[in-house]
């Protein structure tokens, strides 16, 4: 059923994180990959029951403490130290990474194995594959890895809603300040608010921080 499918999908997502780390190491891809887990901090008292409820839901789906657990404030502060901290949830199944360098490294790895990567090739999804000016590519499955930009493809404008995510990044932060902030294992982080935020400590000691506060633009405009 739908629930079982969701659980299988989540377990596959967990497996993918470790597998990606193995590939990065085997191929020598310099992308700052560190699997330090992710911590979701409760920075308001009202966020505590919401985060604990998400842990209970995971437990009922068959995930244990090794997958997702609650941290009391003192333990949570060893991961990240915001000005207010009422506890946090923590999962080890997450990694910090530079996505652009990861993609370029993966492309180079498959090219070394004889795969041809075609760039700057316009394509249009049609039944049974992808049409290009140079010919038809036939495939049983087509992965539309274009995120919100799918709305700019012919016939796709109303099939997805583009959701924006804006990011900022600091200059390199000195070690003395990181001692106050935390993230010593390069944990990724968020908090329990309804608005999605996220961040990570980069390989060169910057803080990369983002959120989903940007508005939807009328007509699925980009």
Predicted regions and their residues:
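Dinucleotide-binding Rossmann-like beta1-alpha1 core, especially the glycine-rich loop
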Residues: 1-73
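Helix-loop-beta segment of a Rossmann-like dinucleotide-binding subdomain
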Residues: 3, 30-40, 75-105, 109, ...
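Generic structural signal for well-ordered, non-membrane alpha-helical segments
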Residues: 6-17, 47, 51, 95-99, ...
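Active-site substrate-recognition segment that forms the wall
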Residues: 18, 26-34, 124, 135-176, ...
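Conserved beta-strand scaffold positions in the cores of enzyme catalytic domains, especially
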Residues: 38, 68-70, 88, 117, ...
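Flavin (FAD/FMN) cofactor-binding core of flavoprotein oxidoreductases
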Residues: 45, 74, 78, 222
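Helical element adjacent to the flavin cofactor pocket in flavoenzyme catalytic cores
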Residues: 49, 56-61, 83-141, 145
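N-terminal FAD-binding dinucleotide-binding subdomain shared by FAD-dependent oxidases/monooxygenases
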Residues: 54-61, 68-76, 84, 97, ...
């Amino acid at each position: 059923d739908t629930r079982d499918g969701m659980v299988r999908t989540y377990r596959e997502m967990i497996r993918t994180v470790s597998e990606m780390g193995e590939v990065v190491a085997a191929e020598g891809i310099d992308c700052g990959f560190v699997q330090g887990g992710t911590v979701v901090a409760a920075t308001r008292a009202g966020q505590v029951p919401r985060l604990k409820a998400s842990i209970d839901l995971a437990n009922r789906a068959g995930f244990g403490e090794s997958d997702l657990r609650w941290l009391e404030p003192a333990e949570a502060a060893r991961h990240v130290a915001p000005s207010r901290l009422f506890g946090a949830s923590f999962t080890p199944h997450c990694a910090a990474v530079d996505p652009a360098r990861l993609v370029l490294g993966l492309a180079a790895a498959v090219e070394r194995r004889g795969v041809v990567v075609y760039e700057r090739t316009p394509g249009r999804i049609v039944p049974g594959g992808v049409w290009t000016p140079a010919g038809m590519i036939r495939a049983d499955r087509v992965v539309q890895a274009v995120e919100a930009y799918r709305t700019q493809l012919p016939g796709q404008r109303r099939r997805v809603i583009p959701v924006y995510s804006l990011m900022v990044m600091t200059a390199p932060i000195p070690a003395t300040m990181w001692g106050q902030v935390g993230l010593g294992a390069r944990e990724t982080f968020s908090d329990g608010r309804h608005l999605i935020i996220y961040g990570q400590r980069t390989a060169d000691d910057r803080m990369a921080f983002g959120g989903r506060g940007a508005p939807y633009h009328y007509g699925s405009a980009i």
